[in-house]
Amino acid sequence: MGTFKINSAFKPTGDQPQAIASIVNGIKNNNKWQTLLGVTGSGKTFTMANIIEKVQKPTLVIAHNKTLAAQLCSEFRDFFPDSSVEYFVSYYDYYQPEAYVAQTDTYIEKDASINDEIDKLRHSATSALFERRDVIVVASVSCIYGLGNPEEYKKLSISLRTGMNKDRDEILEKLVEMQYERNEINFVRGTFKVKGDTIDIFPAGSTSSAIRVELFGDEIDKIKEFDVLTGNTIKTLKHTVIFPASHFATSSDKIEEAIKQIEIELEERLRELNSEDKLLEAQRLKQRTNFDIEMMREVGYCTGIENYSRIMDGRQKGEPPKTLIDYFPDDFLMFIDESHVTLPQVKAMYGGDRSRKNSLVDYGFRLPSAYDNRPLKFDEFEEKINQIVFVSATPSNYELDHSENIAEQVIRPTGLLDPEIEVRPTKGQIDDLYSEIKNTIQNGFRILVTTLTKKMAEDLTDYLKDLGIKTTYMHSDIDTLERMKIIKDVRTGEFDVLVGINLLREGLDIPEVALVAILDADKEGFLRSERSLIQTIGRAARNSESRVIMYGDKITDAMGKAISETKRRRKIQIEYNEKNGIKPTTIKKAVRDVIGISEVAEGKTEYKSMDEAVKADNKNIDKLIKEFEKEMKEAAKELQFEKAAYFRDKVNELKKKLNENEEVIK
């Protein structure tokens, strides 16, 4: 059985040791609710990793979007290379939910494009939870949506062991029931192929390796894991478990039982609609439901089978659906990252889903049981919590009111202080800002400017560009990958000034920023609330030279509280540094390109530029060359020659880089 063991050259410093000890003691004392209140740049992820190592519990980390989840997953994989760190987010590249607009009599069919890579990662996560305890699953809020029943998922899995008596046809029938497809030509994830007494199975959660089962009569003679591309054996196994190809896979006897229940519900609902003279709706419902039933009888599933999940699971009306949380053992630990943003999302999920389903049920497109194909209500989510740690620089009242223990992490390992804040009048603010920008650029640093409106942000960007300042503007229409590219361009000096409205989101921890300017700081509202201001001030906490200028003609209550809290933290930090002889140092952070999972999260091709990801480290470069050569061969095999040529060029670039490094060493 694996255990969590951190792989890091660093040890906890500053406030980290006491925060770790405080949370760990709370977990051991069975505290259900705790909060880690950590300032920006205090190493909250490293603290979380140390807590996980000390308590040795399977852990679910929930983030508020796919990209932040991907970044956390990447960090946890670095900390725990020998454990199973998984990624679980919505697998839709594109999703148009089923809906009906009564005013225009428009039915909108469900339309979705599933990202195969993310589907694989989801299967990898659920299967890992059944196989070991040293598992961390980093998920987005989509983890509270209904998923197949874990008991059925486990029951449907097939355990294979050498020396076991297993008839070949029995294995094949089981694979089909688990929704694996037989495909002798295109051997991909979720398929199997057969040649005599040899069965090759490509597990749903696997990336590039498959399982070969060799039979001798009715006995399993050998089990091997092999590389799908080369065919080479990776290792010989004594035992393996194959999990279903779909989280909604259901045994044939369960389907027959479910069909009976669907037919009973259909009869009841038809009587109801007919009694209300809704003849069109009754006819529509009868036709659609009978078609679904026929599909289930013929092939074991139907389009939109998730709408019958309550009946398939044998749940009562209104009973919460099974979710990823149910795949965890009872003693699991949960972290909610950036809880001040994530929890409101969790609370809002159910309401949005319910309002859309009302018209589908009312107008005869779905049976009432479709209501129970839904995300968890917030109180149901709370009931599923075993032990939880909220993580935020600015926790909301919910977290603070519920927490039995609040561990504060104010000291940064780098000794960096919360920035000094200056309030200046709005009169002549743009000229004043221009002067400050010029001085900051001369010192080799970058600037963040936050405005209240899109128009002002655009106008300011154009104005600064006209004055010869390399300025870019970040707005809400930019997708996550483009956003990450802009951040990279700011870090590398392609741009000196970044203007935006809401600069609080993930990924804006830019060490090169030495000035954060907040325009219209005295305008009350969401973007100028105490929490928003503290978060924005935190963007300046990665550089020892950094400071904040608030432009406003009065100090609002929110400004006063944010300034006061920043001063309190700064005082604690200065005292700690003086006591321990620490000189604040700007964070040195390599400029990395978009990580692979982030690209998968956004459904883009995986072969974007990785130049900055390549460090001048021969071991890393050698590893990348091997990975790219493998990708090149795989692409060529699939006749994707453009993609293959891309990887060929990358391999040549890396080999050149390797030679240059070797010359330097000589």
Curated annotation (Swiss-Prot):
Q: What is its main location?
A: cytoplasm
- Any idea which GO molecular function terms this record carries? ATP binding; ATP hydrolysis activity; DNA binding; excinuclease ABC activity
Domain UVR spans what residues?
A: 622-657
Q: Where is each Helicase ATP-binding domain found?
A: 25-412
Question: For ATP, which residues are the binding ones?
Answer: 38-45
- UniProt keyword Isomerase present: no
Q: Give all residue intervals belonging to the Helicase C-terminal domain.
A: 429-595
What is this protein's function per UniProt? The UvrABC repair system catalyzes the recognition and processing of DNA lesions. A damage recognition complex composed of 2 UvrA and 2 UvrB subunits scans DNA for abnormalities. Upon binding of the UvrA(2)B(2) complex to a putative damaged site, the DNA wraps around one UvrB monomer. DNA wrap is dependent on ATP binding by UvrB and probably causes local melting of the DNA helix, facilitating insertion of UvrB beta-hairpin between the DNA strands. Then UvrB probes one DNA strand for the presence of a lesion.
- Classification via HAMAP family: UvrB (MF_00204)
Protein name in UniProt: UvrABC system protein B
Q: Which organism is it from?
A: Clostridium acetobutylicum (strain ATCC 824 / DSM 792 / JCM 1419 / IAM 19013 / LMG 5710 / NBRC 13948 / NRRL B-527 / VKM B-1787 / 2291 / W)
